[in-house]
Amino acid sequence: MDEIKVGNIFAAVFEKSVLDPLLAILDRGSVKFWGTEGTMKYVKVKGYSGKSVVTSFDFDGRVKSLDRAIFARILADRTKKSHVLGLEELARFTPGVKSGRNLESTPGVSSVPFDLVIVGLYAPDKKNFPESMDIGGQALIRAAIKNYKNVALAFDAESIKELVEHLNANQGRTLLNFRKNQAQGAAKFIAKRTAMEAEFFS
């Protein structure tokens, strides 16, 4: 799939302000956000629709974004009918949206694959390592890398800047070559991050 119109976005960023350049150009009426609670609070303040997607098992924040409903919407191949039907089936039985203090199912809504994934990792702290490893964020990035043919990815301030320029030049759509380049950049980013974490064991 070459062109993908950005309408459904998953966002989970540690430094919320990195989203500002993107939020400044998107059409509030045609874009919906899903993501972690803090990020969704931020995009709502900016006037966008946002739903906090959480897992039923949080474990002090260790697995808050490690949920099959989230990863299915990132990894689904929208050109395959079996994947589309699988998302619809998953949506009927997955409690995945935080509403107040309760989890509620989201039939129909969460069956839509994500068009764009934006992740901003928090910096690892050597003094508090490996507890300070960002597991969920790296997993989200790797999922989007794998499925770049179906979903765009931004993973730091520079890649968000490039995304904004690309969307402006292509009427809010991402092209396959751009998604591939972003995925390659993300793979290099994750490789550097992993190498740094490996050094922390020394």
Identify the function of each model-found stretch:
Residues M1-S52, S56:
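N-terminal glycine-/serine-/threonine-rich phosphate-binding loop
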Residues I4-N8, R28-V31, K46-S49, R68-F71, ...:
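Short coil/turn connectors at secondary-structure junctions
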Residues A11, K32-E37, K51-T55, A76, ...:
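General beta-strand structural signal in soluble alpha/beta enzymes
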Residues K41-F93, N102, V109-N128, I135:
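Acidic/Gly/His-enriched mid-domain segments of enzyme catalytic cores or analogous surface patches
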Residues K98, N102-E104:
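Intrinsically disordered, low-complexity polyampholyte segments enriched for Lys and acidic residues
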Residues V112, L116-K127, I135-L175:
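A short, charged helix-loop
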Residues E165-N168, G172-S202:
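Long, charged alpha-helical interface segments
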